[in-house]
């Protein structure tokens, strides 16, 4: 049985030497991410609400990536405390930025301009704020509205858009699986069509992933 095991990781994370912590993460298809980052326009990574996203974000920052994550402002106190504790233990985590879902997108534009890897989950259960851009997709036979705002910003900024999933492994280890390039802004002439195509691929990949890893579901 696989679990998210993020809260279990929090019990030991501030006791781990940096080298040991970095070694807990395996990145599949990392050259795809490195190539995207090397273009110099930032990179968007489309995630899903499955797996220990916060843990992997911390470990990616320790590997040297300039990372920005979009989160809910009402995030739990435990996660905020862990973030603070690790900021003190690993000063290099200062390069990791936190953006809140209810803010307007100018900070996301700035992150792409500064070469950050911006990560967010698009598969929301409901759209909370009226200013958020969405795209209708079909997943598990149902029509759902998923968030498309960061993807649109990435295309406008010239930032490649990738998709990735987090898979837990034994011994507090994690695997970040970079699936594919969802959108390459160098070839985009029609933003709406590019977003529609990328979102369709994103939804298909999420459905495939959930069927393969049902134990990572956190709510029915």
Indicate where each model-derived feature is located.
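Conserved mid-sequence domains
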Residues: 44, 56-59, 69-73, 77-81
């Amino acid at each position: 049985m696989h679990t998210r095991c993020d809260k279990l990781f929090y019990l030991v994370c501030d006791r781990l030497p940096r080298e040991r912590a970095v070694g807990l993460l395996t990145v599949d298809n990392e050259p795809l991410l490195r190539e995207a980052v090397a273009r110099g326009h930032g990179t968007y990574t489309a995630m899903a609400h499955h797996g220990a996203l916060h843990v992997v974000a911390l470990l990616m920052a320790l590997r040297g990536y300039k990372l920005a994550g979009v989160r809910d402002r009402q995030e739990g106190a435990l996660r905020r405390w862990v973030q603070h504790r690790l900021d003190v233990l690993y000063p290099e985590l200062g390069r990791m930025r936190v953006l809140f879902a209810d803010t307007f997108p100018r900070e996301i534009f700035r992150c792409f301009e500064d070469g950050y890897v911006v990560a967010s989950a698009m598969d929301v259960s409901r759209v909370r704020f009226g200013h958020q851009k969405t795209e209708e997709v079909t997943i598990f036979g149902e029509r759902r509205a998923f968030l498309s705002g960061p993807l649109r910003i990435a295309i406008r900024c010239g930032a490649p858009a990738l998709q990735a999933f987090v898979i837990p492994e034994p011994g507090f280890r994690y695997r970040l699986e970079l699936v594919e390039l969802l959108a390459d802004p160098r070839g985009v002439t029609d933003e709406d069509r590019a977003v529609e195509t990328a979102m369709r691929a994103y939804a298909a990949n999420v459905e495939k992933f959930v069927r393969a890893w049902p134990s990572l579901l956190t709510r029915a």
